[in-house]
Amino acid sequence: MAKSPSNNAAQRVRKKVRKNVADGIAHVHASFNNTIITITDRQGNALSWASSGGQGFKGSRKSTPFAAQVASEVAGRAAIEQGIKNLDVEIKGPGPGRESSVRALGALGIRINSIADVTPVPHNGCRPQKRRRI
């Protein structure tokens, strides 16, 4: 005989843990196709994250500076709820959302201590892909 669904599944849902962290790091990964913003504490534990695609932008609109700005605002508001007041920003990648995402974080009232470019640069490592011809 089949059992009826119980309310145990509803009871197992965890409440969001509200951390009280004042300082953090904003990791901005700006590729040519998307922009992903992750806000962590000093140890690297993620507090909030957002991406351009996750905010409803699809296709070529994901890679616009406006989409990066919207994603930064969403991640920044969630981080402010966790208690973030100061951020160090680490930008990785060559995408168009680099600058607008940092400006959006500053406009939210978060104090930006430093901005660092941590784009990985090969010391002549792997052979690059062939040139794209259109």
Curated annotation (Swiss-Prot):
Gene3D superfamilies, alphabetized: Ribosomal protein S11 (3.30.420.80)
Which Pfam families does the UniProt entry name for this protein?
Ribosomal_S11
State whether keyword Transmembrane applies. no
PROSITE patterns of this UniProt entry?
RIBOSOMAL_S11
InterPro entries named among the record's database cross-references: Ribosomal_uS11, Ribosomal_uS11_bac-type, Ribosomal_uS11_CS, Ribosomal_uS11_sf
A GO MF annotation of the entry reads: structural constituent of ribosome
- Supply the alphabetized keyword list: Ribonucleoprotein, Ribosomal protein, RNA-binding, rRNA-binding
Share an example GO biological-process annotation for this protein: translation
Which family would the database say this protein is a member of? Belongs to the universal ribosomal protein uS11 family.
Q: How does it assemble?
A: Part of the 30S ribosomal subunit. Interacts with proteins S7 and S18. Binds to IF-3.
Q: What is this protein called?
A: Small ribosomal subunit protein uS11
Q: What is the lineage of its organism?
A: Bacteria, Pseudomonadati, Pseudomonadota, Betaproteobacteria, Burkholderiales
Q: Which gene encodes it?
A: rpsK
